[in-house]
Amino acid sequence: MNPNQKLFALSGVAIALSIFNLLIGISNVVLNVSLHLKNNNDQDKNWTCTSITQNNTTLIENTYVNNTTVINKETEAAKQNYLMLNKSLCKVEGWVVVAKDNAIRFGESEQVIVTREPYVSCDPLGCRMYALHQGTTIRNKHSNGTIHDRTALRGLISTPLGSPPVVSNSDFLCVGWSSTSCHDGIGRMTICVQGNNDNATATVYYDRRLTTTIKTWARNILRTQESECVCHNGTCVVVMTDGSASSQAHTKVLYFHKGLIIKEEALKGSARHIEECSCYGHDSKVTCVCRDNWQGANRPVIEIDMNAMEHTSQYLCTGVLTDTSRPSDKSIGDCNNPITGSPGAPGVKGFGFLDSSNTWLGRTISPRSRSGFEMLKIPNAGTDPNSRITERQEIVDSNNWSGYSGSFIDYWDESSECYNPCFYVELIRGRPEEAKYVWWTSNSLVALCGSPVPVGSGSFPDGAQIQYFS
């Protein structure tokens, strides 16, 4: 073969290879375009797409060819629904600890945030702690003076339940010095109260977006529950009070849908004074056990029909008194009037679960101070003035400080055909009781849930040695 023939032959081979490379490139482009169009056509479906991409690169005559394999795994996303309060409370034979954050003990060496008024609230993904921070950490000099409840520096945060609140694990929600929060199954509503005592404003958020505001109606410390609110079929109910803490005040029951007020009611029934309600849901109803800061050492109760969006109120009927401070227990209670006596006022946030023979009430062990905590089983305490204690379980011994307490329920626990009642106890440390050692006031938290079988005993105090902070 002469040189010219060799040249033509090699040129032909090169042209053939080039055409082959070009065809591969065109087919690769067509494949990618078709896959892209198929993805766009499927976007109107409710799919979750997981893609696994494998790239192999081959060099042919200085041309890079990418072979791409795409594996689509399509699963239909779970549909979200509004929470329906369609179960009764579970029977409880005792209480077990499900979380304890030991925040003050950790705070001796870690940057733990100063908080108070903590509570627990759940959603479809689990439960978290909520608390009002003071804009500082325990070891920070700004912690001096954090005994004050209402300042412009406070705000609501949430943290993993059982972990001490630090900057890195805290999720900011809203600015304010009084709060409540609850999940309706689709989104979370949060309310914070901010501003001056005589001209406060409540800000309402749904799914973290500001939806409305509520201006003071009595110009005297507008305030709300300091524990979770409750929702049913898209409607969330909140109890708010404005007015004197030591005489007649003005309480409203407000109904919200997606953070907007759809109805409000002035307090009805025989309760004289309402503050800091601890609410739970069951059987299309919401029951709130509250604080009478004016007269009653027996706790007022608000019963709310969520379908009718109507309520009534009375007092716990039992003569076993559960506010602090309080006089001695009475042999006969009163369903419609406050039980007074020395010491009586002012009070502390508390809770109860009212379920006929399955009724449990919480209270401090000391009748005069916020120390110790116990759970009392008092069948029919909500309806029978003669009801008495049948069981007692110590939660915090009387030699240790307690504080506020409140109820919560994981309504999304599908493992049970009933709602298991749960509660938390705030364990306050620092001022005023320990002013000898520190200038700050903060808390840790312990949370407990019901057990269907009898349990053992134990005390679960804060546990910090306050002198270590001196």
From Swiss-Prot:
Regulation of activity: Inhibited by the neuraminidase inhibitors zanamivir (Relenza) and oseltamivir (Tamiflu). These drugs interfere with the release of progeny virus from infected cells and are effective against all influenza strains. Resistance to neuraminidase inhibitors is quite rare.
GO cellular component: host cell plasma membrane; membrane; virion membrane
Cofactor(s) this protein cannot do without: Ca(2+)
Gene3D superfamilies, alphabetized: 2.120.10.10
UniProt keyword Electron transport present: no
Intravirion side: 1-6
Keyword Flavoprotein in record: no
Record: residues binding substrate: R116, R150, E275, E276, R291, R370
Chain intervals for the UniProt region annotation (Hypervariable stalk region): 36-86
GO terms for biological process, alphabetical: carbohydrate metabolic process; viral budding from plasma membrane
Topology class, membrane: Single-pass type II membrane protein
EC number(s) from the headed UniProt entry: 3.2.1.18
Record's subcellular location: Virion membrane; Host apical cell membrane
GO molecular function list: exo-alpha-sialidase activity; metal ion binding
Function: Catalyzes the removal of terminal sialic acid residues from viral and cellular glycoconjugates. Cleaves off the terminal sialic acids on the glycosylated HA during virus budding to facilitate virus release. Additionally helps virus spread through the circulation by further removing sialic acids from the cell surface. These cleavages prevent self-aggregation and ensure the efficient spread of the progeny virus from cell to cell. Otherwise, infection would be limited to one round of replication.
Database matches in HAMAP family: INFV_NRAM
Protein name per its UniProtKB record: Neuraminidase
Organism: Influenza A virus (strain A/Seal/Massachusetts/1/1980 H7N7)
